Amino acid sequence: MAMATSMSLNLIGAFKGLSLSSTSSFLRGDLSFSPKTSFTVTLPLENLQAPIPLTIESAHKKGAGSTKNGRDSPGQRLGVKIYGDQVAKPGAIIVRQRGTKFHAGKNVGIGKDHTIFSLIDGLVKFEKFGPDRKKISVYPREIVPENPNSYRARKRENFRLQREKKKARRENYSYTLPTPELVLASASVDDAEANPEC
């Protein structure tokens, strides 16, 4: 019995902040170690208060929900910027892409992020490049003189004449259309005698 009390005092001294409940069979002197007996340990509440607030962190990516993160990120603004048969200036970006969906053709360069850009001033053409590839080229623009008899040219001239008439009416003087004058070329009599017709 003396051994049990000294053992309990040693335990109480070792666990200074802990207290064994009075319902414990150990303090009452019951030394039967059966599976039915249980120890209950109570801790004082003032020692349980944490000095800093606790933060709960997940140890694994899955626990943190990384599969749900990053879904609302903005797009990368990829795609075709200048389409076929449109004018491109030197240095103009034609396509921004990941990898080479489009390959570089004539008069275009390719950047380290596979951006295709124009090297000259001209028209952009999208061409087939093999069975399953596409190539982008820029060809110099050939300026074709406009046909003066085309519908667009006649319309432009008609509107120009209307503007001139309206301007003349505002300035209070009559506007007369310039009439085409027939100019006849006449040769002097001396030249006609010197060069007789045969």
Swiss-Prot record:
A GO CC annotation given for this chain: ribosome
Effect of a null allele: Embryonic lethality. Embryo development arrested at the globular stage.
GO biological process terms held by the UniProt record: translation
Cellular localisation: Plastid, Chloroplast
Keyword hit for Chloroplast: yes
Keyword annotations of the record: Chloroplast, Plastid, Ribonucleoprotein, Ribosomal protein, Transit peptide
Signal peptide boundaries: none
Transit peptide boundaries: 1-58
GO molecular function: mRNA binding; structural constituent of ribosome
Family label: Belongs to the bacterial ribosomal protein bL27 family.
Complexes and interactors: Part of the 50S ribosomal subunit.
Annotated PANTHER family: LARGE RIBOSOMAL SUBUNIT PROTEIN BL27M (PTHR15893:SF0), RIBOSOMAL PROTEIN L27 (PTHR15893)
Name assigned to this protein: Large ribosomal subunit protein bL27c
Protein source organism: Arabidopsis thaliana
